[in-house]
Amino acid sequence: MPKAKIITLTNQKGGVGKTTTVCALCGVFSSRNKKVLAIDLDPQGNLSFSLGASMEGLTIHDVITGKCSFDDAIERTENCDVVASNILLSGSELELNSAGREFILKEKLEPLKSRYDYILLDTPPALSILTINAYVATDDLIVP
């Protein structure tokens, strides 16, 4: 069974085009009839806003902290499925304090890999436990 390619957009600096690139890739891949999931790992939530996802419902914070599953948090938008983020994600750093915490995202993404062609991860402009989780889970890194 084919598995999704996970692509992470990352850079320690803000304003370099990470979110814009994720939005563009969503459009390109979906125009080629590819199934895409975009995950906003930045507490600022710019990807969520740009893709028209609600930042008031269940978010990646709820998934990472075990309050819900990815299936509960996925929202369908025009070009792709989205797991939104909001400022609450900032608190995840404090909640993720167990051994193996850098593998949480990878483990939670595994069941989704057979349902998508691409999973795109938009990271915050900092080296945090969320960014490390993205690095562990990813197949390819793009550093704009």
Predicted regions and their residues:
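P-loop NTP-binding core
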Residues: 1-144
